[in-house]
Amino acid sequence: MAPLTDLLSCSIIEKDSNGDVLWTWSYPVILESQKAVVGRKCNLESEHNSSQVFIFSRHKHHWFYIHCSEVFDSDKLPKVKQFALVLFAKDFNPRKYEVLSRVLSKMYCKTGKPTEILQLYLSVFTKGSCSTQENGTFVSDDFNSHRFTVNTNIRELVKAFELETILIYTALLLKKRIVVYHHSLEELLKWIGLFPALMKHRKVSDNLFPWVDLVDDELAELKRHSHYVAGCRNSSISSRTDLFDLLVNIPAREITVASHAKESLTMTKTHKEIALFMVQLSENQTYTEAQIISEINDKTQDLLNQLTSLAVVQGPDGRKMVSAQTLKEKNLPFAVENFLINLAVAENLFLV
């Protein structure tokens, strides 16, 4: 079993019977900037805080996962009404850290001792697993990429947006700024977790921001990225066209292309064929989720192979690149030429 060295820290935040909130324990250390964003997300200070048990998002280059628990009279936590267990990690894997945070939270309810949490945390960090008699077992190796993929639901995404799913696919392929809106946090986190599976050849999670509040520090962090997939619960995001090229409104089942991005997201015959292909895949009940993802990836590879075949000019570093002149000589329709240029730029294959 491999050690889980992606783990960075573990913290406990408690809300007592008087409504006071306190960071009672952290290991090895947590920064003030991390405390600020976690405090905003878990919202323990509110009298009507979210009933969402497990939430996740990112802060700078790291991910955080929060498991919130109600405390009952039978638990070993007198005067504590609620607590949140917070994990910071280097990797994006909500399923893995939901299980781990649940095991740790159950142990804290039972014992009320941070030292017990520390023992389990160190076991996971050094051995990749921890085991308790009554509160469950965690094995990091159980959450490999294949099992994570199987638990996505691209079929549901395509059924929701039908032929317009191609806009999401193309925006991801061309590294555009995508904002996903849903008023429900639970639904937002569920839907936005599907997007990386559409681009199997690329690590979309590097530019994934599952839950962004429209506050200065989070927006400043978002704007440091030239492309991203960002989730938002605030409906006013629809007027912030400075933040997106494509807006996906989940409850309304609507996709909006910002006016400044319409030319680069113009659909070609190839796009329409892929759109129809994805709809047919979603309707075919004999296909598993993994097969749907694999079929879409094959279509993506066909596009990339077509692009590579046009890379005939040697760049400064010796790599074969695509030039505007090469595309001009092909006498392609404007929309196709424009798409290939944008794809070459996204794949770092365009010679300026």
Positions of the model-derived regions?
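Acidic, Ser/Thr/Pro/Gly-enriched alpha-helical scaffold modules and adjacent low-complexity linkers
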Residues: 2-352
